[in-house]
Amino acid sequence: MNSFSAFSEMFGSDYESSVSSGGDYIPTLASSCPKKPAGRKKFRETRHPIYRGVRRRNSGKWVCEVREPNKKTRIWLGTFQTAEMAARAHDVAALALRGRSACLNFADSAWRLRIPESTCAKDIQKAAAEAALAFQDEMCDATTDHGFDMEETLVEAIYTAEQSENAFYMHDEAMFEMPSLLANMAEGMLLPLPSVQWNHNHEVDGDDDDVSLWSY
C-alpha cells in the first residue's frame, strides 16, 4: 500500500486540505510560471528547473525551504532523497502560508495534503516531512530501498531566520579554519603537522585534489 491511501490511513481524514472546498479553485502551478535566472552567475545553479523551493546538494539529495510572506526569513523544511519529495514538502508549506494564492508544484497537493492549522514553523515542518514520507513510494524509483528516514528529516527541519544564500558563505568561511583544524588533529593523533601551503585568499583552486596531507 502506498501513496495517498497509506497517507490517509496513517494520518486520518483531518489531512484533507482546507483549501479544497469549492469546485472552482484552480491552483497556480510552478510549471506555468517560469523562474527568473539566478542573479549569481559565478556559482553553479542548484535550483530545480521547475519545482519551487527545491535545491540540489552536492551529495545528490534535495533540500527545501520557503520564504515567509512579507518577510526576508525562510522556513527550513529538510533534506530529501528526491526532488519530488522536496516539492511535496514545499506545497504543504506554501498552502499553509499563502492559502489559495500559493504557487504549487503539483495541482493535487491542494486536496491531497494536510495543511497545518497554524503557520508555526514547527507545525509546517512536521506536516511537510509527513507529506514527503507518504508520497515516497509514488515518487521514488521502484527499488527495494528508497533510503528515506522521516525521523532524520524531522530532526533536520529546523527554523532558520537567514536567507538561503548565506549558507554558501558559511561553508566558504569554514575553509579558512582548516589550518588550525589540521593542527589540532595532528596534535591529538601525535602526528607531525602536515606541510601544506595554505593560501588565505578568496580564490580556491579546485584542481589541487591530489595534494597529500601525510606522507608515510
From Swiss-Prot:
Top-level taxon of the source organism: Eukaryota
Effect of N2S: In strain: cv. Cvi-1
GO aspect biological process, one term: response to cold
InterPro entries associated with the record: AP2/ERF_dom (IPR001471), AP2/ERF_dom_sf (IPR036955), DNA-bd_dom_sf (IPR016177), DRE1A-I (IPR045277)
A Pfam family per the record: AP2
Ranges annotated as DNA-binding: 50-107
Any GO molecular function: transcription cis-regulatory region binding
Induction, as annotated: By cold stress. Positively regulated by the transcription factor ICE1. Subject to degradation by the 26S proteasome pathway in freezing conditions.
Motif (Nuclear localization signal): 35-47
Keyword tags: Activator, DNA-binding, Nucleus, Stress response, Transcription, Transcription regulation
Presence of the UniProt keyword Transcription regulation in the record: yes
GO cellular-component term (any): nucleus
Subcellular location: Nucleus
Purpose: Transcriptional activator that binds specifically to the DNA sequence 5'-[AG]CCGAC-3'. Binding to the C-repeat/DRE element mediates cold-inducible transcription. CBF/DREB1 factors play a key role in freezing tolerance and cold acclimation.
Similarity comment: family membership: Belongs to the AP2/ERF transcription factor family. ERF subfamily.
Subunit structure, as described in the record: Interacts with 14-3-3 proteins GRF1, GRF3, GRF5, GRF6, GRF7, GRF9 and GRF10 in the nucleus upon freezing.
Protein name: Dehydration-responsive element-binding protein 1A
Gene: DREB1A
